[in-house]
Amino acid sequence: MSSLSSAPFGRVVTAMVTPFAADGSLDLPLAARLAQHLVAHGSDGLLVCGTTGESPTLSWDEQLALIKTVLDAVGEKVPVLAGTGSNSTAEAVEATREAAALGAHGALVVVPYYNRPPQEGLEAHFRAVAAAAPELPLMLYNIPGRTGCSLHPATTARLLDCDNVVAYKAASGTTSEVSALRLACGSRLAIYSGDDGLTLPMLAAGAVGVVSVTSHLAGVELSAMIDHYMAGRHAEALALHERLLPLMEGLFCTSNPTPVKAALELQGWPVGAPRLPLMPADSSVRDTLSTLMAALRPT
């Protein structure tokens, strides 16, 4: 488990892909092996059933099975967060309760999507989720490019009177989001980068870690980059950032998680194609990823 008081879920939290078998069903044994591999290669926290885990295409029974599988595999070593967000408050409340009952160490709760509630509605939504499982630490997740609305810093600051609101995934695509949150919330909120390529500048603005996709492939290097920065070795951190950036950007050349699943396949992890409506990576994406991963190998 993480002992980093300022980073309650660890510094590198991998937003884990969901492996599928050839028939499209969950491959739970592979999910367990992948979780163990990630923890052994730089991840000090895991998130299951997030965007990268294709939660919109998973039934709730599948999500519960996946959460339990990953908890059984690595839950005694690192924090395991469950994605429990929904644009229905009642569904988010129930999902969060069930994740807590399974023993999850935290929940990632996304801003309600599509129905675009006002700030008052967002505040009421998150308060209801927090009250449903008061013992379960929550990470709020702001990603306006996917949800159609944004959680404002002032609203976030008001939510800090819920004792279990402890962290925030910043995925608006700007480092200024971190600065605005720091001004509104001070050090009471652990801010995580939700964009691999912005992790280093977000650390400089006050973030404590990253919820990462790239860590599937370069977790050791990403962890080292953060360690260098936190220890004041900024030149070393910058060098690693620049080395990783092409891969970080390449993993978002089309809709996530299509590229990272293809990259894992290229590394020998048969995680399967994404479920529809997402599509498998085409040959040009696979060729690009192969080149980018080759560039990271030691010479």
From Swiss-Prot:
- Which EC number(s) does the record attach to this protein? 4.3.3.7
Binding site residues for pyruvate? T52, V211
UniProt keyword Glycoprotein, yes or no: no
**Entry-linked SMART domains:** DHDPS
What does the record give as the active site?
Y141 (proton donor/acceptor), K169 (schiff-base intermediate with substrate)
GO BP term, example: diaminopimelate biosynthetic process
Q: Which GO terms describe its molecular function?
A: 4-hydroxy-tetrahydrodipicolinate synthase activity
Q: Which reaction does it catalyse?
A: L-aspartate 4-semialdehyde + pyruvate = (2S,4S)-4-hydroxy-2,3,4,5-tetrahydrodipicolinate + H2O + H(+)
The UniProt keyword set, sorted, is: Amino-acid biosynthesis, Cytoplasm, Diaminopimelate biosynthesis, Lyase, Lysine biosynthesis, Schiff base
Q: Which Gene3D superfamilies match?
A: Aldolase class I
Whether Lyase counts among this entry's keywords is: yes
Q: Where is this site: Part of a proton relay during catalysis?
A: T51, Y114
Subunit structure comment from the entry? Homotetramer; dimer of dimers.
What family is this protein classified in?
Belongs to the DapA family.
The protein depicted here goes by the name: 4-hydroxy-tetrahydrodipicolinate synthase
Native source organism of the sequence: Synechococcus sp. (strain RCC307)
The gene it comes from is dapA
